[in-house]
Amino acid sequence: MTMEALQFLLAAPPGAYDPVARTIEDEPRPSQPPTSALALDIRGLRKSFGDNDVLRGIDLHIPAGQFVTIVGRSGCGKSTLLRLIAGLETPTAGHIVFGEDKLPGDVRVMFQEPRLLPWARVLANVEVGLGTERNSPDARARADAALIEVGLDDKRGEWPAVLSGGQKQRVALARALVSRPRVLAFDEPLGALDALTRIAMQRLLEQVWQAQGFTAILVTHDVAEAVALADRVLVIEDGRIAKDLPIDLPRPRQRGSAELAALEGEILRDLLKGAEDTFEL
């Protein structure tokens, strides 16, 4: 794709050249109420692996329903923080308290790799996200509703092998959404996608977040993605929060706008300064 074509797409109204958005608008919406999101309070959070202190004392409050993005250089601790929030790791010190009693399935994670079962069709892969409720009478209807939300209900009977990379990630998103999580954590889920598919997926993530109302926490290396999606951007440096920047811009946001570019520049300057301090450039 030429730079001119990409700029044309970025300047277009949301959905104008977005096959995902068009599919979702054309399909009937599942008649499900918004999710009751969870707030998070993180106090004195530390994580070490042997002698390596990855997180060095994180204090953070995330209100229910907020969309938070986390950026930082490789090895700064951002993915470790996400895994601690998701309960995939145990902290060395400190604690994470959710706003209400958290139940199994309230927190879900979507990774960069879709991790689909190759021997199961799309609908069955989505049903996996229901966990112990997979055998409930409404399991198939709930999985169908999740596929409609991501614009893939016409692929319910396909095998994962025939899907594109973007379609596989949309199935993974449906699998995460099907249990109606109250917190959804994203660990660089769009990192392996091409530019156009990535933009379409960013818009889809924003749409399902607005529709379901869960608390969203996204780890990404892409500063433009972080600013476009977030209510708030956290910069992690050397295991600590180096910057906590609110993004007070109306939605939907215009990619390539001067306001977004200014915020991206501010965050990039902080990241580059941290790199210079670390490597003494």
Curated annotation (Swiss-Prot):
It is a peripheral membrane protein. Keywords: ATP-binding, Cell inner membrane, Cell membrane, Membrane, Nucleotide-binding, Translocase, Transport. It catalyses: ATP + H2O + aliphatic sulfonate-[sulfonate-binding protein]Side 1 = ADP + phosphate + aliphatic sulfonateSide 2 + [sulfonate-binding protein]Side 1. InterPro entries: AAA+_ATPase, ABC_transporter-like_ATP-bd, ABC_transporter-like_CS, ABC_transporter_ATP-bind, P-loop_NTPase. Part of the ABC transporter complex SsuABC involved in aliphatic sulfonates import. Responsible for energy coupling to the transport system. Gene3D superfamilies: P-loop containing nucleotide triphosphate hydrolases. Residues 40-263 form the ABC transporter domain. Its main location: membrane. The gene is ssuB. ATP binds at residues 72-79. GO terms for molecular function: ATP binding; ATP hydrolysis activity. GO terms for cellular component: plasma membrane. Belongs to the ABC transporter superfamily. Aliphatic sulfonates importer (TC 3.A.1.17.2) family. Its EC number is 7.6.2.14. The complex is composed of two ATP-binding proteins (SsuB), two transmembrane proteins (SsuC) and a solute-binding protein (SsuA). It comes from Rhodopseudomonas palustris (strain ATCC BAA-98 / CGA009). This is Aliphatic sulfonates import ATP-binding protein SsuB. It is an enzyme of class 7 (translocase). It is found in: Cell inner membrane. Pfam families: ABC_tran. It comes from the Bacteria.
